[in-house]
Amino acid sequence: MYNSSTNHHEGAPTSGHGYYMSQQQDQQHQQQQQYANEMNPYQQIPRPPAAGFSSNYMKEQGSHQSLQEHLQRETGNLGSGFTDVPALNYPATPPPHNNYAASNQMINTPPPSMGGLYRHNNNSQSMVQNGNGSGNAQLPQLSPGQYSIESEYNQNLNGSSSSSPFHQPQTLRSNGSYSSGLRSVKSFQRLQQEQENVQVQQQLSQAQQQNSRQQQQQLQYQQQQQQQQQQQHMQIQQQQQQQQQQQQSQSPVQSGFNNGTISNYMYFERRPDLLTKGTQDKAAAVKLKIENFYQSSVKYAIERNERRVELETELTSHNWSEERKSRQLSSLGKKESQFLRLRRTRLSLEDFHTVKVIGKGAFGEVRLVQKKDTGKIYAMKTLLKSEMYKKDQLAHVKAERDVLAGSDSPWVVSLYYSFQDAQYLYLIMEFLPGGDLMTMLIRWQLFTEDVTRFYMAECILAIETIHKLGFIHRDIKPDNILIDIRGHIKLSDFGLSTGFHKTHDSNYYKKLLQQDEATNGISKPGTYNANTTDTANKRQTMVVDSISLTMSNRQQIQTWRKSRRLMAYSTVGTPDYIAPEIFLYQGYGQECDWWSLGAIMYECLIGWPPFCSETPQETYRKIMNFEQTLQFPDDIHISYEAEDLIRRLLTHADQRLGRHGGADEIKSHPFFRGVDWNTIRQVEAPYIPKLSSITDTRFFPTDELENVPDSPAMAQAAKQREQMTKQGGSAPVKEDLPFIGYTYSRFDYLTRKNAL
């Protein structure tokens, strides 16, 4: 059994020995206190003296063999009868200043535990220290089996310390109280932890500051790198630009020699700027001619193949004999050969004989001609090249040629040839001996609604054909509606009218209006000018006054009609049939042709145009104020359908009939009820011209044209032609550049029956 008390030998001295023990324990306590202060309480705490187990007890308890061997080795160091337990991270055993164990024979029993020494106040050491050296004092005995952590925990709560050597020993204060030492150690631990936390936080803040400084330095470094790269890139670009400029300033041969890349090849440099302007024009002309030659060759080859396939299909559908089919194919082959020879033949003015002049204009004239080799009659339209340049009519001339050449419709005048010389462009077209619609209006003044319905229906079909080709006529008027030999109409003058091309330019009318207001004092629409006479005011206040068909006014209308014909041959023209949106530069479409149709219909039923005036300026004002100026006279009766159709045509572009539905929208109007649109051209016309010969021009004002002088441009061109003929010269090549490809020949001229 484990005995926690210490037995002294009987007969030992009491008083002297007690004084000696008290002095010896004071020295021991001082050394232990000094030693505890020097050591780190977190690493090692001094062990109380005289705490150990006997070797016999360890053997009886069956301790480990290694521990027994260790105890046997240590027995010689501690004297007889005592062994020492190996220290677990304890410092070395204090110096053997206490010879009490050596001088007193102790029973070989287990020594008292540390808990017994520090837990009880009646132990031998405290008794000796207090002067009570009685060896009969009994200490409480605890066996190892009776010791537990719970008992130690309860003892700690009561202020006593644990006696287990396997728990960390605590430092004793001078008064022997363990609880105060425990609190001091815990407070010291908390202080150390707080200091460590502060240090950790300081280290973290320093690390963060250092990281931020590193990031800023890295960003600055990256920015510097980017700036350096940009500067290097700019320098490289500048060097490349300088090299390109140097290369451009040098010829390829020089640059090749400089770069060392020249080989046995020979380099040619294109420098057209070193050539004269005339040479450059000739080179451009040759280029365009070659391009046009191959384009036309491919086009004619495709058309030739299509004609043969069409004929073979037609022959297959008929039950003809093989001999007859062979004759048809042979006839087609002969016509193709003639056409190829005709294409290679260069036509000129000398190939035609002029019968008479049937029309004049600002830029040319219209002649009745006869081809010398065939004797057929044609209408030749002549246009002056120099005026086309000056008046910016090159696009219009080309458009007119394309429309006439690309259309096979019976509603459009047929074009047979087109060619040119140094001064003029020539269009050889079919001759329509019935004249034009203006001639019929001058002769009969008024049309009935049935006659008007017939001609307006044919005009709708003709305009629809032009629109399907992708063109806008923009100059539909009675002068350009021709009558063929059977009395049906055809449209002509596409893009260029004889003397009316300026009416398509709003600046022209604005200029005329400003000049007229500044010089003649003509008032604006709806205003009254007191400086003019009453008679003039009656004719110039268009908004208020309307033309009434009195005898005097009818005479004025007839006079206007005669002057209207002469006006067509002048350079001034009249805007009677032009839509208002053309003047405003607001953009226009195909609906502008339907306005012209409404104006012509008004003239056929009423007897004069809806905005008739004595001057173009007045007509312009009336058209721009059509809502007030469009009036119907009371003494001329027309049907409600006719008036409704006219009003729906002479209105704003967005509300105009035909704007959205095209020609079909106009065809469905009640005024055209009963019209057979599919067979109208086979219907007998209201008027069929009667001719005495193929050169009969009674329906053309040839007598009036004799008194019309040629335009200054035409007169000057005639003089230049005479001089060029005498000198044998030619016009500059520059004037031929826009007209390359203007030449044209129609294949089916050989079989057309309407050519006279």
Swiss-Prot record:
ATP binds at residues 358-366, 381. The active site is at residue 475. Gene3D superfamilies: Phosphorylase Kinase, domain 1, Transferase(Phosphotransferase) domain 1. Pfam families: Pkinase. One of its GO terms (molecular function) is protein serine kinase activity. The modification Phosphothreonine is found at residue 109. It catalyses: L-seryl-[protein] + ATP = O-phospho-L-seryl-[protein] + ADP + H(+); L-threonyl-[protein] + ATP = O-phospho-L-threonyl-[protein] + ADP + H(+). Residues 352-672 form the Protein kinase domain. This is Serine/threonine-protein kinase CBK1. The gene is CBK1. One of its GO terms (biological process) is intracellular signal transduction. Belongs to the protein kinase superfamily. STE Ser/Thr protein kinase family. COT1 subfamily. Its EC number is 2.7.11.1. The lineage of its organism: Eukaryota, Fungi, Dikarya, Ascomycota, Saccharomycotina. SMART domains: S_TK_X, S_TKc.
